[in-house]
C-alpha cells in the first residue's frame, strides 16, 4: 500500500511543498527512515537527523527550512501531533482479518448476524447474540448469550464478551479484553475481618476462619457508541444493574 505525497497531503488537508509524485509506503523517525518513508521530524530534536537520513520526504512543522536538509518534498503541519493521527491512520494496514465468516467459527442457529460481518476462526457467537452490520470479529472471540453488538464493531483476537452485554455502534475492543465477567463479590454471615479492619483503620482485625458466600452478578454491562477498550482490560458486570 503506497500513496503519493500529494495524495497524502490532500487526504490530510495539509499543505505540501516539493515533488508531489513521490510514492510513500510508511513512516519512521529520520534516523531509521528509508527512501519510501516519510521521516517524522515535527520536533526540533529530530531535525538534526534529517541530513543523514535516507528519506526524501518529511513531515515538519510549518516554517521549517526543509530544503537545507536535502529533502525533495515535505508535508507542513501546524499541529504536528494531530497531523500524525491522520497520517498513521492512512498508512495503517491493520490486522488484515479475512473477510466473511470462517467455516471454523461456531455460530449458534439462534444468533443474529447482520450483513457484511466477518468472523474469524475458532470464534463463538452464542444463542440469542446479535452482531451488527459491518462488524469484524477476529479469531478466538467469544460473544455470549443475548449479547448485542452494534454496527461497525472491530473486535480483535481473543476478546471475551459474556452474556447479556449491550454495546453500541463503532465499538473497538483490543486484543484480550474481557467484558461482562462476574463482579467477584463475596460476603460472610458476620462482619468479616476485612470489614472490621477497614472500619477501625486496621486497629482491630480478625484471622479466624469464616464462610464466604458469593453475591451473584445479576446485572450486565452497557457500553455506548464510539467506545474503545484497551488490550487485556476487564469490565465486570453489575450486581443488580448494568455496569
Where would I find each of the regions flagged by the language model?
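Terminal amphipathic alpha-helical/low-complexity segments used for targeting or macromolecular assembly
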Residues: 1-104, 165, 170, 175-177, ...
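Structural signal for interior beta-strand "rungs" in well-ordered beta-sheet cores
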Residues: 40, 100-192, 201-243
